[in-house]
């Protein structure tokens, strides 16, 4: 399943904070089957957007809960356009 995470940072983002968060995410990827397709810092209502795959909603939720100390994350389920188009048939 694909997910989009809309992130607001709670802490000042330093190189050390970012490096530690990336280390944790990579460990989760290996352990829980999460695959991060991209992390982008953004301007506007959210500080960052993450696009990732997880085996199911529960694993995606666990990832968001683990990050709760450092960031607020709204997680959206994303359906690839090709799959959504099939629903129109």
Language-model-detected regions and their locations in the chain:
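Short S/T/G/P-rich N-terminal loop/turn motif that feeds into the first structured element of a domain
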Residues: 1-30, 35, 42-46, 79-89
């Amino acid at each position: 399943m694909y997910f989009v995470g809309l992130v607001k940072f709670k802490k000042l983002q330093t190189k050390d904070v970012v490096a530690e968060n990336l280390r944790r995410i990579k460990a989760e990827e290996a352990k829980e089957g999460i695959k991060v397709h991209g992390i982008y810092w953004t301007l506007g209502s959210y500080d960052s957007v993450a696009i990732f795959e997880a085996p199911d909603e529960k694993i995606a939720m666990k990832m968001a809960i683990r990050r709760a100390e450092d960031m607020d994350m709204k997680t959206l389920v994303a359906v690839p356009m090709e799959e959504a188009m099939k629903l129109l048939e």
